[in-house]
Regions:
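Low-complexity, glycine/proline/serine-rich flexible segments
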Residues: 1-48, 92-94, 98-103
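Short, aromatic/His-centered strand-loop micro-motif at the edge of beta-sheets
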Residues: 96-120
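Outer-membrane beta-barrel translocator domains and adjoining extracellular loop/strand segments
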Residues: 150-153
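Conserved small/polar residues in nucleotide/adenosyl-binding loops
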Residues: 158-160
Length: 160
């Protein structure tokens, strides 16, 4: 089968044709904008295994901020949840879990995310049933598994 010659302009978003991405969002950090979903229910299919996938593009690289957070504020003002936060002056993404205002586990790849024009595809796979601690949290950027970490305090066995 032959293919007609079609020029391909290589850009950071060439897979998208360099066009506007429909249904994408940009948040103004000074507005404290957020999306909230309260309809997830209280009976997950698994409390031990999950995968989270998201595309994102940085608009403010030099500030520490949250990319994705979930959790709740318990009685007495204690907070629990699993934030994905930009740390180290906003250059690295840290995946962690907090319980009662204390960090249970935290994994921060060494990769710097400083390109405000690039789209990143992040996949985080959590499997607390794995016997080897480093297999319990796996992080992928653009399809490549991260193996070099700034911080690697893995979660304990069956802890979610």
């Amino acid at each position: 089968m032959t293919r007609a010659f079609l020029p391909h302009i290589i850009t950071d978003d060439s897979a998208l044709g360099g066009s506007v991405i429909e249904r994408s969002l940009i948040f103004n950090s000074s507005d404290s904008t957020q999306l909230e979903n309260t309809s997830l229910g209280t009976s997950p299919t698994s409390r031990r295994i999950c995968t989270i996938s998201v595309w994102f593009q940085r608009n403010e690289v030099d500030e520490e901020s949250g990319l994705l957070t979930h959790g709740y504020s318990g009685s007495g003002g204690s907070a629990s949840g699993a934030p994905f936060r930009f740390v180290d002056s906003g250059t690295r993404l840290s995946i962690m879990n907090d319980t009662n205002n204390s960090t249970d586990w935290k994994v921060t790849p060494s990769r710097l995310l400083r390109d405000s024009t690039a789209w990143y595809h992040l996949v985080v796979a959590i499997d607390t049933t794995q016997g080897t601690a480093s297999n319990r949290v796996k992080i992928y950027y653009n399809g490549v598994q991260e193996t070099d970490f700034e911080t690697a305090n893995y979660l304990s066995l069956i802890h979610i």
